[in-house]
């Protein structure tokens, strides 16, 4: 089963609250278990490119069923570069996305962009705690 729109909306709201409490302006992407977008949100003042980065991080987390930070070292691997080309360069192998897990099943992922990589991941963690 994949993350639902209702769950995605709850995640977005919690992520926005976490970012706002730190005076951060970020974009948040929630993708399903295949890495396809369910919801993407850009806070007022977040940079124009951050939604795409948030989505790319979330895609990596969902596709590999682990935090995107765990994939950062593999970004230069020829297989990963080919996979990224197959996905039109949308994959972002950097910290800031976490899988959405229910039981033992990955239902999707949340990606955040616009703050430091650690802050992005912390916002994602706070959002997942809302589920």
Predicted feature residues:
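Flexible, solvent-exposed loop/hinge segments and secondary-structure transition points
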Residues: 1-131
């Amino acid at each position: 089963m994949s993350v639902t729109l209702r769950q995605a909306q709850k995640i977005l709201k919690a992520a926005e609250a976490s970012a706002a409490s730190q005076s951060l302006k970020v974009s948040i992407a929630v993708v399903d278990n295949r890495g396809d977008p369910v919801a993407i949100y850009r806070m007022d003042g977040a940079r124009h490119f951050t939604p795409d980065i948030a989505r790319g991080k979330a895609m990596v987390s969902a596709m590999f069923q682990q935090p995107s930070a765990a994939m950062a070292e593999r970004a230069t691997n020829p297989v990963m570069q080919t996979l990224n080309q197959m996905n039109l360069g949308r994959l972002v192998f950097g910290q800031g996305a976490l899988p959405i897990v229910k039981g033992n099943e990955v239902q999707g992922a949340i990606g955040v962009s616009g703050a430091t990589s650690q802050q992005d991941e912390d916002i994602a963690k706070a959002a997942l705690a809302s589920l």
